[in-house]
Structures are given as structure tokens and as C-alpha cells.
Amino acid sequence: MEVKGPSGRSFCCESEGQFKSCLKRHTPSLLLPSSWKGNSGSCLMAEALHRTSPTPNSCPLPLPLCRMSGVLCSRNLFTFKFSLFQLDSGASGEPGHSLGLTLGFSYCGNCQTAVVSAQPEGMASNGAYPVLGPGVTANPGTSLSVFTALPFTTPAPGPAHGPLLVTAGAPPGGPLVLSTFPSTPLVTEQDGCSPSGAGASNVFVQMRTEVGPVKAAQAQTLVLTQAPLVWQAPGALCGGVVCPPPLLLAAAPVVPVMAAQVVGGTQACEGGWSQGLPLPPPPPPAAQLPPIVSQGNAGPWPQGAHGESSLASSQAKAPPDDSCNPRSVYENFRLWQHYKPLARRHLPQSPDTEALSCFLIPVLRSLARRKPTMTLEEGLWRAMREWQHTSNFDRMIFYEMAEKFLEFEAEEEMQIQKSQWMKGPQCLPPPATPRLEPRGPPAPEVVKQPVYLPSKAGPKAQTACLPPPRPQRPVTKARRPPPQPHRRAETKARLPPPRPQRPAETKVPEEIPPEVVQEYVDIMEELLGPSLGATGEPEKQREEGKVKQPQEEDWTPPDPGLLSYIDKLCSQKDFVTKVEAVIHPQFLEELLSPDPQMDFLALSQDLEQEEGLTLAQLVEKRLPPLKEKQHSRAAPSRGTARLDSSSSKFAAGQGAERDVPDPQEGVGMETCPPQTTARDSQGRGRAHTGMARSEDSVVLLGCQDSPGLRAARPTSPPQDHRPTCPGVGTKDALDLPGGSPVRESHGLAQGSSEEEELPSLAFLLGSQHKLLPWWLPQSPVPASGLLSPEKWGPQGTHQSPSAERRGLNLAPSPANKAKKQPLFGSLSPAEKTPHRGPGLRVSGEQSLTWGLGGPSQSQKRKGDPLVSRKEKKQHCSQ
């Protein structure tokens, strides 16, 4: 055996294994029979195939009579010759004579050509028939296989090579059958490409029938046009259209050729039939096989087509052009859709259904051409057996072909839906269009089976089980369907239904729950407070904790006239003073304590008893307990603390100066009751004041816990002598930003060290007025003079020069007799405070009026729960 490469080097093989390995090394694609057998069935060992001459056409040594067949594939510039020898036992291999069979393949431009020559030398006596395929018999008239697989690829750029001579020994009287059906599947190159030119491939068959030297042989050439010999690589484009590669040889019908007759599938060459050869008779009708490709408008196969029906009954006419033609691609696509039920029938649970359907297209076509009388069941059985013996690498091309067909099917579905939307009503259809039920019993089971394609076929597995709808028109261009527009169409179809429901959902949160509204009303009523007083509800019950929140249905808006009258009363200075005078001292003491433990039941009983008493009776009732507690309590607790030590030093220095009173001093105070004036309040006041100023500075909040605060309860004057100023809070007690120790010390240094007695009520209520605005000017706070009975003026008033120097306008109150009081709500730096009880004296700089707000103070006091409405009316009448 000799294998010749492009460089002209010859390779000799000593054995069958060496021969196969040599061919594999120098051949890109090779497919050999499983065994090489002779007539006796023994394997042929080619020990001395080529030892005579290095030339390709040399004759080997004589060998025993045998029949051999082989398959050769060529690629690029390689040229191979495979010589098979079949000799009689008495024949001799003389040099110069061709005693065997030689096959060769090469390229000719864009067409794949092969020349077959037969030399029947020395073989007429035994009647042996040379064959070109494995597993054949020598019976005359039997359809034999020529080639198992011949993948022709595009040659590399270079000079065109002429066709190689392929010679085959044939007896003069024996038939030579050239069958186009391959017995094994095609093995294509991984990187192989087919010629881009479309058209038929010409196969030149040359027969030699002389006995003698090869050079004197008479040859007759016939051109066989075979459509599918133009092979296409996976995914390649042919004329702008994706063409699934044809897999197996499909040529003209099988025609038996007798002796000196050569029949072509399509036409003869230009030379015609030469040298007196008779024209070939027309092929028998029985030999004409119906092609497998169906028309584009062919419907799905009926169920009765399965079973004993023949392949011929289910086939259509073959296309005249190659597989790259768009019409051929479309017909293959329709066949693939028709074969899917058959594939599901044999592989119900396999994901290879689509790939197997692609595999059935060329296999069933070839079986139909080889044996038209073969039933469909037998053809499917042979195809399944061939599929099982196919390697995964060989199946790759079918998976890719199935992937393209799946894309075609998805595109067709989308086009059908669009056409239905255009023809149907204007409203959008439901997002999921019902699809046709797949044919065959096992179809529902395969719907859930995805198709696992090796390359980019995973996401497209869902569309594999869809049945083929009837086409409206032939698809002239195969392109991949864009998945995004399809999704947008489905999204738009789902959007309209929820639109009417969205406004209803957004209106629900706008409604406020009733319990939230009620909670808000309760909080506002608790903060504002005056709404309860406006309803006329007794404030005594509020003091006792028995007040219930008014219901919305019972609440009525207050009378504007009543509100204006209340504002008018609160704007009067005497009205607020009268209200403060009747506040229960026990209630104030418990209320201002750090941990109040109020007995509301006992307090309510006391208040009920006091409702029937007059103001004089109230004073007589409350004054003795106050005197006893004032004597028992320590004097330092009555003085207010200083903020720093410097102010206490100045206070101590001024205490000695107060021992000598100024006869011209006077204060705008009202006269004290007889019980108060009978005591030596001057001396006691000076003693208390001096002791108070020697104390260290303490914040009022800390002083409120001391017993002095509880002892310093207000003393109600007689009915004819009422205080005309609200309770006074000290500057130290308020502890506000305006109260600077420097300012206090500055005022003491100027000599304004006169002190006055502070009402205990105002002193105790100082912490309640910390929210009032601080109106202290930059001028120092004046000090009030001491109040003594002998220093009263003609009208019972006593004014200090410091007050006069500061322009303190003191006018008598219209509600009091022969009494003067400082103007309420004036813009003076400080105001004088009346004496509410004996012995309660504090420094003047601490006597900051907490009622500077005027009407605002009255409005705040209006809603104060400390004064009952009945007592307010009594004071208003006075």
C-alpha cells in the first residue's frame, strides 16, 4: 500500500495496523471498515503491498484472491490513493499491467470531482465483482454501496489540481452498480468548510474495459450531477441564509449498469457517448425513488402514516437545487417538524428529541432512495440503531441544526401571533397564546423535557416541544428571533388589567383612623386646657382628678361674648390678685412638693366646705396655721439663694445699712391687715434678710424642697385689703438667662439695698413661671424699702427714693381704698411687691414679677386649675 502526500513522498505500510495509522497521520478525516476480509473471511495482512516500485501506479506483488473496500477523505492539498487488488489464483502480477482497484480523490476549483476507472484484467474468468463499499455481496443486480462517507472541503488557496484517476477492476459481463447511499454516517472536519459556490458537483466516472496495458485503455467519461455534494460547515452562511449542513450523500437514483453501459443520473458530458457505445436505456420505473423532501405547504403527517406504511407514501419530491437554497432549508425545517413526533415516540424521556429529528432527515431520505419498499417502522428502527452507534462528537452537528430550527420555530410563532393581532380586534390578546397540541401519545410527557444542546441551546429548550403550526407563507429568510420584543409584547399585554385598580389602592391610606384622630384631640385638649373652662365644667372636679374629657358630640363652641368678658376680666390687675388670694394653700403646698402625695378626697371635702364661706372667714381660717408654721420654721429658709458668693457679700454689707431707715422712704404697697401691723415686722424682716444674704447661692429648685418653702404659705388679707399685684418670683428662683450675678452685685453696690416683704404665694409659684419671657433690662434691679407701720404716708403708702429715682410710677389702684400699687404690665425694670404676711422679707433684687406679661399672664391663669370658677365670680363682684 502506498500513500502519497503533496510533497511527493511515498509511505509504505507493512501491516493492516500500520496502514490504518499511516492513513490517519496523513489524512485529516478517515473512516475505515472494521475489518478487511477476503472471500474466505480471513483478515488480509498487507505485508508486501508495495515493494516493487515507488510510483503510485505500480503493481504490487501477487496476492491471494480477495475483496477489499475502503474509505478515503481528502483535505486541502493532500492526494491519496488506495489500491485494492483482487487477483485470481493463477494470475501473475506483471509490471505494466493494472491488476487491482485504485481509488483517488482530489479537488477541482469549487467543485469536488472524482474519476472512476475500471480495468477488468484477469477477472473475467472467476466472475468476481469488484465493489466499492464494505459488507457487499457478489450477487448480480444487488444494490451496492460505493462510498461510505466523502466529506469534501474547500481547498487552500493555490493552483487547481486535476482530478485523480480512480480505477476499479470490473468484469466485462458483470454489472457495476454505483449506489449513492452511504452506509455509515458522515464525519466532517471540525474546522472544515464547504465551497461557497452553489451548484451541482460533477463526478466524472471513467470506465476502462480493455485487457492489456493501462496506457492503451479505452475510457468513457460520464458526468453525474449530484446535488448535495456541496457540504456546508455548521453555522456557515450560503447566500446570506443559514443552511443546515447536509449530512449524507444524496445523489441521483440508483441505476444498475451492465457491461459496457454507464448510466448517469442527470446528463452526459459534452463529449457524449463516444466510440460507438450505445445510449443508455431509460432507468426502470422501479428504480426511481421518490425523494424525501416534502413541499412547503405539506401538512402534518396523519397518525396512520406510522406503522406498516412505506416511506414512499410519506415523501415528497426532492428539490432540484442544493441544500443551501432557502427552499431546501425551509423544506428541511418542515420535515424536522414532522419527524419530531416520531422521535418522541422512540425517545419519550430523552432530551435528544430535536437532534434526533434532524438526524432522521438525511437517514430516512437515504433509506427511501436505497429501498423504496422499506416500511417506516423498519426505517425508524435502522435510524435509531445508527443513532445509538453515533458518537457525541458526530451528534454535535445535529444539535446545532436543531438549535437553528428551534429559532425558526420561535420566529414563526411570533409572526403568527403578530398576524393574528393585526387581523383581530384592537384589544390586546392574552399574554400566553394557546399552542397546538403535539402529535403522538408520548408528546405530553416530552413537553417537560428540555433540549440540552452543546452550544447556545440551553435557553431555547422550552420551545422544542411546541408543535409546528401551519405556515401562512414560506419563510424566505432564516434569522434568529429577537427575544426582547416578544417579552415587551407580553409585558404590554399584562399592564392594562391592573391600571383601574391602582387608584383604589392609593386612596385607602389617605383616610385617618378614628382612634388616631381621637388621640390627637385628647393631646391637644390636654396641652391647651382652656377648652374645659369654656365648657363651664367645674374646675374643682379637675383638681380632684375626676374631670372627664368632653365628648365630641357634647361639645359646643364657647360663646364669643363670654370669651371677651373673660379676657376683659383677666386684663384687670385686681382680678388676678383676687383669684390668687383664694387658692387653697394646702393644695399649693402639696402640688409644689417634689413628690406630691395629695389626698384628693380630703381636699375636695375642704373645698366644698369653703365654698359657703366668705373671704373674711377664709382669712380667719387660714391665717392661724400660717402664723404657727412661720414661727416654727427657720428664717434662712425664707430667703432666696444667691448665684454666686460675691452677691452674698454685698448683701451682708447692705444689711447693716438697713438698720437706719430713711424717713423719706416710701413704697407703693397696700396696708397690711391689723394682725400683720401689730408685730414688729421691721426688726424681724431685717434679721431674716441679713441671715438670708449670708447664705451661699443655691438654685431655687433646690430651695423648694426645704421646709421654709412649705412654711411660707400666703396669708390672705382682709376683705378690704387685698394685694394688687400677682405673686412675685425672684430672679434667683427663676434661674433664667437674664439673671446675671454681675447685674445683681452691681445693683447692690449702688446702694439700692432696701428690701421688701415677698408674698409667700408668689415665692412658691416661682417655678411655675419659668416659661415666661425674661424682660430684665440692662439696668440694675432696685431694692424696695422695708415696710414699717410708722413709715406709712398720709395715705398709707411708703416709697423709697431709689424707686423714685428709677421713675417708678406708682398710682393708686381703683379697686383699693387709699392704697397704691405699681402699674401692672409696665416696662419698668422691676416692680414692687406687696406684703402678704409679716416677717416674710426678701431682697428687692429677687423680687422679679412673674406677671410681667399682663394679659398673657391672665390668660395663663385663666386655665389654671388652682382657682375655682365660683371663687372667680365672687372676686369679680367685689
Swiss-Prot record:
Superkingdom of source: Eukaryota
Coiled coil: none
Regions of compositional bias (Pro residues) in chain numbering: 278-288, 427-444
Region described as Disordered: 273-324, 417-511, 527-560, 622-757, 775-878
InterPro entries: NUT (IPR024310), NUT_N (IPR024309)
Stretches with biased composition (Basic and acidic residues): 537-551, 622-631
Pfam families (UniProt xref): NUT
Family statement drawn from the similarity comment of this UniProt entry: Belongs to the NUT family.
Protein name: NUT family member 2E
Organism the protein comes from: Homo sapiens
